[in-house]
A protein has these predicted regions:
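S-adenosyl-L-methionine-dependent nucleic acid methyltransferase catalytic domains
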Residues: 1-125
Length: 125
């Protein structure tokens, strides 16, 4: 029987430099969700353009910039997963008023597209 090792890594998933390429079978993560107000500060601290876009009521740009930050996480996950490995992402969509517009910010679709663009596949529900 093949021995497996379970290890929990807590830290910034944008840089998993201590983790070898193609060495992880399962990644479970719950990132901050773009366009949920409680996470605005975390995103804005990483890219000042986000706070500027939010102040200008530019939801589309804010959403895009936040997802650009998360793309670094998705790229690292793709790098460390073994072929056939699984990325389990807890994803929440956002509904929010920006200026006079109330809308859905579809985080799920954006994140799934990022993984598919990185060559991964979506599992059925």
């Amino acid at each position: 029987m093949k021995k497996t090792i379970s290890k929990i890594i807590i830290g910034d998933s944008k840089c998993l430099s201590d983790v070898n390429r193609s060495s992880i079978g399962l990644v479970v993560t719950s990132p901050p969700y773009p366009m949920i107000a409680m996470w605005d500060e975390i995103f804005s601290n990483q890219d000042n353009r986000i706070s500027q876009a939010l102040k200008a009521d530019n939801g589309t740009l804010s959403f895009d910039l936040m997802h650009r930050l998360l793309q670094r996480v998705w790229s690292e996950i793709e790098r460390v997963l073994i072929p056939g490995g699984i990325a389990c992402i807890n994803i929440g969509d956002a509904t929010r008023s920006i200026g006079r517009n109330f809308q859905l910010f579809d985080n799920r679709s954006r994140i799934v597209k990022s993984f598919i663009d990185n060559g991964m596949q979506s599992l059925p529900n």
